[in-house]
Swiss-Prot record:
It comes from the Archaea. Belongs to the MtrH family. This is Tetrahydromethanopterin S-methyltransferase subunit H. Its EC number is 7.2.1.4. It comes from Methanococcus aeolicus (strain ATCC BAA-1280 / DSM 17508 / OCM 812 / Nankai-3).
Length: 319
């Protein structure tokens, strides 16, 4: 294990802390709710869903947070403004921790930022995300909101290398004229979480993990990713699972995906990750123990270098 020479930022969002030296703070774990084809969603256009089931999922993740000490975040996904604003209003009622405002629609993200500001729970919110494709309207909407935390994506489509990821944060890289960190500061973001933008195996997955070390070593900022997307985009695994299903081994096909899906989060955690977007919140009882165990291994080795884990670290709760 190692210790960074660079002083490491620790940020606090809705009572949860992220960052620091490896082995100091437990890894934050963010589960996604209301994602595409989530069985609890009854109408994804109007944002109608099973409230009891949604609350149960959020509460289960909260229980895992209490058990392991790993900070929990709720990644709230909605495909349009109406749905996303309904979803975040509900989550704010039943959860007092951090939540990510997430959508493939810029209009939905803008509506969510505005709603969170008007309703008074912007301090819980993490914008997802500031990246090279953000336009002026979305940027200005973020400026006018009360949101102070955001995922900052270090992805340059023109340069997927580790150097390219650092450059896009600092000066815009090969795609834009403004660095993402400068853009975040101008938008009023005080608490940046750097997403190293994991790409598929064979297309830069390894560089993404290495970028975690580079960002912390050079900038000292909290880093993480949605690394579970790596097995989801792995063609070989998809074909392997198909073969298992055709052979009547349906359960094994599911298990293989779960192992790779949860295992990917361990890779990011060992790669000096401070947070992981682990995928469906339904998997909380799989993700939390796996990452807590990884955090404990890191903390044990880091103690020899003088790093002291916080009281809520899994190593102080699960032994």
């Amino acid at each position: 294990m190692f210790k960074f020479d660079k002083e490491q930022m620790v940020i606090e969002i809705a009572g949860r802390k992220f960052g620091g030296q490896p082995g100091e703070y437990p890894t934050g774990l963010s589960g996604t709710i209301f994602y595409a084809r989530h069985k609890i969603v009854e109408d994804e256009i109007k944002g109608i869903f099973d409230k009891s089931a949604a609350e149960a999922l959020i509460n289960k993740q909260a229980e895992m947070e209490d058990t392991t000490g790993n900070p929990a975040l709720v990644q709230v996904f909605g495909g349009n403004p109406e749905a996303l604003t309904k979803y975040i209003d509900f989550v704010a009622e039943v959860w007092d921790g951090p939540m990510l405002l997430d959508s493939t629609s810029g209009e939905a993200r803008m509506a969510a930022a505005t709603r969170a500001t008007e309703a008074g729970y912007a301090n819980q919110c993490i914008y997802n995300s500031i990246n090279v494709s953000i336009d002026e309207a979305e940027f200005q909407n973020l400026v006018e909101s009360d949101i102070e935390a955001s995922i900052v994506l270090c992805f340059d489509p023109m340069d997927p290398s580790v150097e390219g990821k650092l450059n896009v944060l600092l000066d815009g890289g090969k795609t834009t004229d403004t660095g993402m960190l400068d853009l975040a500061e101008k938008a009023g973001i005080k608490y940046p979480l750097i997403d190293v933008a994991c790409t598929p195996l064979g297309s830069g997955a390894g560089q993404s993990v290495r970028a975690s070390f580079a960002v912390k070593a050079k900038l000292g900022l909290p880093v993480g990713s949605g690394i579970h997307n790596i097995p989801s985009a792995w063609d070989w695994l998809r074909d392997f699972r198909k073969g298992l299903r055709e052979a009547g081994q349906t359960q094994l096909a599911k298990d293989v995906h779960h192992v790779c899906d949860i295992g990917a989060n361990i890779v990011q955690t060992m790669g000096s990750g401070d947070f992981v977007l682990y995928g469906p919140i339904d998997n909380a009882e799989l993700a939390f123990p796996a990452v807590a165990m990884t955090d404990m291994v890191i903390a044990e080795t880091a103690k020899d270098m003088g790093t002291v884990p916080v009281d809520t670290h899994p190593i102080n709760k699960l032994l």
